[in-house]
Amino acid sequence: MSSNLLRDAHRIVVKVGSSLVTNEGRGLDEAAIQEWSRQLAALVRGDESHGGQRREVIMVSSGAVAEGMKRLGWAARPKEIHELQAAAAVGQMGLIQMYESKLREQGMGSAQVLLTHADLADRERYLNARNTLLTLLELGIVPVINENDTVVNDEIKFGDNDTLGALVANLIEADALVILTDQRGLYSADPRSNPDARFIDVANAGDPALEEMAGGAGSSIGKGGMITKILAAKRAAGSGASTVIAWGREQDVLVRLAAGESIGTLLVAQTHKNQARKQWIADHLQLRGSVSVDAGAVAKLRDEGKSLLPIGMVNVDGEFARGDVIAVRDALGIEVARGLANYASAEARLLCRKSSVEIERLLGYSAGPEMVHRDNMVIAGH
């Protein structure tokens, strides 16, 4: 099961901790980042070493604070938030320069994306971040993501990049999250103090016993311990992404995982990603509004599984924002489907009975040809 899951994964989020990209906290490890870049490029290109399947890959990388400390000449990790933010600002320059350089050597384009909790809490910003990342992936670009440490405070921080990796996996509906660390994976107890500790090769990501098995804090270089990785896997499983926790120094670990080799601990999501999203839509009680559609649109939705296009819309009721859950109703007012609105209510009113090719002319921009995409829609009674 574990080998098939990673072998078949098309969209993958990879998270590497500080200890895997720095020289024991003393600045960036150029050779390590070069090696990560080589493996990332192999996955994106679809090298024969892992079956020739092209992947979409996002890298969530720590290391900015450690690099900033080196550039500033600081021997110990600062405790004051403003000093940490200063170190992150200085170090992020070096971190992204290193990835850009090493990925370019592999013939890969890269992009820097800095996120905050506010970006994912606000629905409009969430959708913008999602669409940007999906566009980058379609272009064959490797996004390198980190938290925007310079502008956040403790109340709105993700807390660690394990959590950020899980949230990014949810954001782009990844098939898998790979968390690379300085440990082999998960044990039933701390193997450093318990010789009877048993290695866990596969488990249900939602198993509450996993949190009891996980140990305490991580190293002084980074912030995450095993418990943050378990909680990240649980969060990622909510959108259908399974998680692998593995030793990042394992030779060709990403390429071998993609080839189907069982490495580390696999925490399996019990729900398929499409099922998870559609169940959330179906269970949504607070509908923000609705659109009425003609008989032709009803047939397209029910019988052919098509997306809802503006040309089939007759009327718009209520006030809703882009990304809100709305109902799709027939001429009698009966709910045919519900889904995520791709346009706000004011925009939707302008689009009624219009061809999708007119969207940009009417609105000044286009967020896609659909009012509700079929992947974001649940048909009533199905």
From Swiss-Prot:
Record-linked InterPro entries: AceGlu_kinase-like_sf, Asp/Glu/Uridylate_kinase, G5K_ProB, Glu/AcGlu_kinase, Glu_5kinase, Glu_5kinase/COase_Synthase, Glutamate_5-kinase_CS, PUA
Keyword ATP-binding (UniProt): yes
Catalytic activity: L-glutamate + ATP = L-glutamyl 5-phosphate + ADP
Top-level taxon of the source organism: Bacteria
EC number: 2.7.2.11
Compartment list: Cytoplasm
GO cellular component, one term: cytosol
Entries under PROSITE patterns matching the protein: GLUTAMATE_5_KINASE, PUA
GO MF annotation list: ATP binding; glutamate 5-kinase activity; RNA binding
Keywords, comma-separated and alphabetical: Amino-acid biosynthesis, ATP-binding, Cytoplasm, Kinase, Nucleotide-binding, Proline biosynthesis, Transferase
Principal subcellular localisation of the protein: cytoplasm
Pathway terms, separated by semicolons: Amino-acid biosynthesis; L-proline biosynthesis; L-glutamate 5-semialdehyde from L-glutamate: step 1/2
Similarity annotation: Belongs to the glutamate 5-kinase family.
Functional summary from the UniProt entry: Catalyzes the transfer of a phosphate group to glutamate to form L-glutamate 5-phosphate.
PANTHER family: GLUTAMATE 5-KINASE, ISOPENTENYL PHOSPHATE KINASE
HAMAP family named among the record's database cross-references: ProB
Name assigned to this protein: Glutamate 5-kinase
Naturally occurring in which organism (per UniProt): Delftia acidovorans (strain DSM 14801 / SPH-1)
Gene, per the UniProt record: proB
